[in-house]
A protein has these predicted regions:
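Nucleotide-activated chemistry modules centered on ATP-dependent adenylation/adenylyltransferase
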Residues: 4, 11-99, 113-193, 201-246
Length: 246
């Protein structure tokens, strides 16, 4: 992989250490759909995957992020990171972005379309979180938010024919790893064929549950944050986490 060579040249010692990693890789894994919450949290994981000859396809789907300006900054940084390594990057709201609302009188501008897509996606996320607005961080609202994003990621993996998906959320020490893994496992189960689904032709997908905080990846994340001069957010993303920081 071209990006594998590029990464190892940046830091030979760390690449060698990663090769000796004790992280368990599913047998036969060659590609993984990697849900990315942000560029900083993705950086060390992507480097690790490439060092182990696993192709990451980055999927950016985070309708929880508020406000729109913050969302656009984080998305742009994620895309910049992927493009710098020649890695495929998929916009989770790409279908909405590509649609053009036209009439006899006007064609929707790019700026208006971006704003409409963001507002629509965030409103749907808020509806899914209804009733949990006052829950604390790492509580039941976060668990539901993880599942909301993992379900869409699982569906995208199934659509693309990629048998495994994972998430960079599992790299954050501020998040509950058990909640994240439970959300991923449930999402994989919910998109698969059920025992009674006679004639079901949907391909099974699997969640790669992993603690991406181990093996020096947290320290490597911090180093890459400076190396790439990434924007480093100060709160999780949603308005509720933003208020909890104020």
């Amino acid at each position: 992989m071209a990006q594998n060579l590029r990464i190892s040249e940046k830091n030979t010692n760390f690449a060698t250490k990663m090769k000796k990693s004790s992280i368990i890789v599913p047998e036969g894994l060659k590609r993984v759909l990697l849900h990315a919450c942000c560029a900083p949290c993705s950086s060390a994981i992507v480097e690790w995957l490439c060092a182990h000859e696993i192709e990451p396809i980055i999927f950016y789907f985070n309708p929880n992020i508020y406000p729109q300006e913050e969302y656009e900054i984080r998305k742009a940084e994620s895309k910049r990171h992927a493009e710098s390594l020649g890695i495929q990057w998929i916009d989770g709201d790409g279908g909405c972005q590509m649609s053009v609302v036209s009439s006899q009188w006007s064609v929707e501008s790019q700026e208006s379309r971006v704003e409409r897509c963001y507002n629509q996606a965030h409103a749907e996320w808020l509806e899914a979180m209804h009733g949990l607005e006052n829950e604390p961080e790492r509580g039941s609202r976060c668990a539901r938010c993880f599942y909301y994003r993992m379900l869409t990621t699982a569906k995208k993996a199934q659509e693309l024919g990629i048998p495994y998906f994972a998430t960079t959320l599992a790299s954050s020490r501020w998040k509950n790893l058990e909640q994240i893994n439970a959300a991923g496992e449930r999402a994989a189960e919910d998109v698969g064929c059920k025992m009674l689904d006679v004639g079901c032709k949907m391909a099974d997908v699997h969640f790669w549950a992993q603690n991406w905080r181990k093996e020096g990846l947290q320290e490597r994340r911090n180093a890459l944050l400076k190396e790439y001069a990434f924007y480093n957010q100060q709160y999780c993303g949603c308005e509720f986490s933003m208020h909890s920081k104020s």
